[in-house]
Amino acid sequence: MKILRKTHPLLKIVNHSFIDLPTPSNISSWWNFGSLLGMCLVIQILTGLFLAMHYTSDTATAFSSVAHICRDVNYGWLIRYLHANGASMFFICLFIHVGRGIYYGSYVLSETWNIGIILLLTTMATAFVGYVLPWGQMSFWGATVITNLLSAIPYIGNTLVEWIWGGFSVDKATLTRFFAFHFILPFIITALVLVHLLFLHETGSNNPSGLNSDSDKIPFHPYYTIKDLLGIFLLLMTLMILALFFPDILGDPDNFTPANPLNTPAHIKPEWYFLFAYAILRSIPNKLGGVLALVLSILILATFPLLNTSKQHGLIFRPITQTIYWIFIANLLVLTWIGGQPVEYPFTTIGQIASITYFTIIVIIMPVSNTIENNIIKL
């Protein structure tokens, strides 16, 4: 008798990707975050779909439609808070996933890595346009400030900003198009995820030792499906605790006030997961320089395969670069903290030092430590 999953054209693809996939036998829990990101994407698309059924993308009714979802729709409050906090869980998993990729040298699989960077940028764009939709004070002013940064682009800047706004300020046209973008982008992300997996399965997974694992592989199912289910259970539990006990802990109090173009909040800041990039943007006094630094703070990830001079794969046997890596992570946490602080001394100075450190570690210090370690091996 033929096994259906091995012969059916559609099931065969699923089988080769998730069931009989040869997987290194030693991959740790840090490799769980790929499946957790998939789970987050499914949660966001499903909760988002139900929210879109009740939301109205009009400046006059957007804020009250979100209030209506929370008050009058069956379990609307839960769907809304799962969606809002699901975004935070999504970004926590994303940052850990990227961090694991840097630590274990997964960037040598350059196609997978580059698609991952595109995925990160697309997810950030989706979260940004989504944050505008409730049409609270921080939604409105966040949209105004961030889109206005494009005006720093020479020659076409002002035209580009007005084109994105659909007028001379953030208004009804902006909200409507942002809703359209927020609806379509998750499906683009899903397509990119499939490409990401396609490239990953071309080369096979990396593993903690950084050594070739072709001689020691096991099927993905049941070993890693069970392991992933544990991760998914823990993720769902954390998300439910957040959504049920602390639903607004990661939000901004200003967003409980309807958008008012005549009243600027004291401190305009984005969601917590953008604060590191926002701190880098604010640390440069020049507008265009700040925008370039903001974009480069993410695009610099693409330089990892190019700047990698190490003869070893990953950081597991490289104590010098390991120490630098953890300094880099600590520096990112400092940037995140600074992004949420007011623009005044000493925060501006700390932000500038942390921003310089961020770029210096990636471009100069890590390649130098790689070379030092290569020379130590020769001794």
From Swiss-Prot:
Keywords: Electron transport, Heme, Iron, Membrane, Metal-binding, Mitochondrion, Mitochondrion inner membrane, Respiratory chain, Transmembrane, Transmembrane helix, Transport, Ubiquinone
Disulfide bonds: none
Residues annotated for heme b b562 binding in this entry: H83, H182
Pfam family, one: Cytochrome_B
The keyword Transport is annotated on this UniProt entry: yes
Predominant place of localization: mitochondrion
Binding site for a ubiquinone: H201
Membrane topology, from the record: Multi-pass membrane protein
Subcellular location: Mitochondrion inner membrane
UniProt xrefs under InterPro entries: Cyt_b/b6_C, Cyt_b/b6_C_sf, Cyt_b/b6_N, Cytb/b6-like_sf, Cytochrome_b, Cytochrome_b_C_euk/bac, Cytochrome_b_N_euk/bac, Di-haem_cyt_TM
Matching Gene3D superfamilies: Cytochrome Bc1 Complex, Chain C
GO cellular component: mitochondrial inner membrane; respiratory chain complex III
Lineage: superkingdom: Eukaryota
CC cofactor: heme b
Residues annotated for heme b b566 binding in this entry: H97, H196
UniProt GO BP: mitochondrial electron transport, ubiquinol to cytochrome c
One GO molecular-function entry: ubiquinol-cytochrome-c reductase activity
Cofactor remark from the record: Binds 2 heme b groups non-covalently.
TM region(s), chain numbering: 33-53, 77-98, 113-133, 178-198, 226-246, 288-308, 320-340, 347-367
Subunit record text: The cytochrome bc1 complex contains 11 subunits: 3 respiratory subunits (MT-CYB, CYC1 and UQCRFS1), 2 core proteins (UQCRC1 and UQCRC2) and 6 low-molecular weight proteins (UQCRH/QCR6, UQCRB/QCR7, UQCRQ/QCR8, UQCR10/QCR9, UQCR11/QCR10 and a cleavage product of UQCRFS1). This cytochrome bc1 complex then forms a dimer.
Function: Component of the ubiquinol-cytochrome c reductase complex (complex III or cytochrome b-c1 complex) that is part of the mitochondrial respiratory chain. The b-c1 complex mediates electron transfer from ubiquinol to cytochrome c. Contributes to the generation of a proton gradient across the mitochondrial membrane that is then used for ATP synthesis.
Note: Heme 1 (or BL or b562) is low-potential and absorbs at about 562 nm, and heme 2 (or BH or b566) is high-potential and absorbs at about 566 nm.
PANTHER family to which the protein is assigned, alphabetical: CYTOCHROME B
Protein name as annotated: Cytochrome b
Species per Swiss-Prot/TrEMBL record: Deltamys kempi
